[in-house]
Regions:
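Nucleotide-sugar donor-binding/catalytic module of glycosyltransferases
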Residues: 1-234
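C-terminal subregions of glycosyltransferases and related glycan-biosynthesis enzymes
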Residues: 222-334
Length: 334
């Protein structure tokens, strides 16, 4: 529709590669085939950081950069891992574009992926308030040959929100489209620790702005033996990983919230009069994060944790996960 047309606007796709030669061409081709220019008037640029590949990935990147010099650029980085790689891409991303998106190296994007995200970002935009906006969608799980596999585990039962983000990440990084405000906030104070880069962006947007989770699936999320992070397709492995998340990752989640609180203080110090960081709703959310950190683990804090559950409505998406989470939170194991 004409109302969504944005002449001369640009979206920059940020991709991190590491030993990705097997599926990289298919991924890049699907990005180049996006219809955001035709549907939205928004041009596309692809900016790639290689994280020290040793399988010839760089040759493929050279090939595409030479063939599409106006659309694709890349640079060689040291091996620092996927989280730091994406935050470095944020640091080096183009200041002048309006939208940003993350990309993995081994998926397949449906042609409407970016235009769907841009359209929703525009729908969420309040031009009187500069707030961080994040769009993400449900990933379609596929095998190495892009054949659909069991997708029950990608379905979300509840809404996206900060009360969910403090204990669970539902944002798959490669489905993200964000506005410049969210990118700027992440760039200003990158975290010293986060469980995963996409989880950090979920926390930022759900605390200070808006998140839209699209149940439509615009990305084929490839599952194979070498992808660094992905969903597990084995039900047994899925259950074991769920238990592991509750038992092992709870400390990382608390550590992540502590870092989130630290950076909130930096935002306030830099812009003490900015109502984006200093309003009743944000203060309520930060207080929730603070209480989860302060009253974790020790048995004597069980009454406090009961009160937190009652007054805040913290939740996980899946019913079984929510029950297990509440039990371990109240028992003092969290």
């Amino acid at each position: 529709m004409q109302i969504y047309w944005e002449e001369n606007k640009v979206i920059q796709v940020l991709m991190s590669t590491y030993n990705g030669k097997d599926y990289l061409r298919e991924q890049i081709d699907s990005i180049l085939a996006q219809n955001c220019k035709e549907q939205m008037g928004v041009s596309l640029k692809l900016f790639i950081r290689d994280d020290g590949s040793k399988d010839g990935t760089q040759k493929i990147l050279d090939e595409y950069a030479e063939k599409y010099p106006d659309k694709i650029s890349w640079y060689q980085g040291e091996n620092i891992g996927v989280i730091k790689s994406f935050f470095e891409l944020i640091e080096k991303s183009d200041e002048k574009v309006e939208y940003y998106a993350f990309s993995d190296q081994d998926d397949y994007w449906h042609k409407e992926k970016l235009s769907a995200g841009i359209k929703q970002i525009k729908n969420m935009t309040n031009y009187d308030v500069k707030e961080p906006l994040l769009y993400c969608c449900s990933p379609l799980l596929v095998d190495e040959n892009l054949k659909e596999i069991d997708n029950k585990m990608t379905r979300k039962e509840k809404r996206a929100g900060f009360e969910n983000a403090v204990v669970e990440n539902i944002v798959t990084g490669c489905t993200i489209v964000m506005n410049k405000k969210l990118r700027d906030m992440a760039k200003a104070y990158p975290p010293k620790f986060t469980v995963m880069h996409d989880w950090w962006f979920y926390l930022l947007a759900s605390c200070y702005g808006k998140v839209y989770y699209d149940k439509n699936q615009y990305i084929s999320y490839r599952q194979h033996g070498t992808n660094t992070v992905g969903y597990n397709t084995s039900k047994v492995k899925e259950f074991k990983d769920r238990v592991k998340r509750f038992r092992g990752n709870r400390q990382n989640i608390t550590k992540q919230l502590s870092e989130f609180i630290r950076i909130y203080k930096l935002y306030n110090k830099k812009e003490p009069d900015n109502t984006l960081f200093f309003n009743d709703e944000v203060k309520r959310k930060i207080r929730l994060a603070y209480e989860l950190v302060k009253y974790s683990k020790k048995v004597k804090y069980i009454p406090k944790r009961v009160a937190i559950l009652k007054k805040t409505g913290i939740y996980r998406q899946r019913k079984i996960d929510n029950i297990i989470f509440q039990i371990i939170l109240l028992s003092g194991s969290y």
